[in-house]
């Protein structure tokens, strides 16, 4: 029986293959190694707030001189429906890194037409007048405008702009940043996630 660097208990063959292909693709691009057990406290993030359970199936560190970043293989359980409730299970890949500065609470995602309309009625989005391309592309909600606007400098915004994927969510709680999406596991998307967190971790 093959040994995998992640927990395969109860996983079907397709999920194991997807995780393994992603791991192998990451190994080709980055110097990664398993972390062993670390509690990343994912329940603090709104991205997982509606989940009944969040289980890290595998965690891997990308080593840099200036700081480490992480790739997480995550299993989530949540409920769908109100009257007729069904339990749903998904497997996802998320990136995580620790930031030097305290950003407060921040959520960043691609801006939709609905966001633009709502912003006209109830303005609460953080915009950067000096960086219209960023503000026109991303929807940014924060709980502390002073912290977020000072920490989200040009280098940070450029890193977000350079992500080679359209469907992602970034969330920051104080010094901890995660990035991921709710799509099925795809190795190429995981590479884009890893590129972003490695870039932030390497910003001395």
Language-model regions: role of each:
Residues 2-204:
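Charged, low-complexity intrinsically disordered regions
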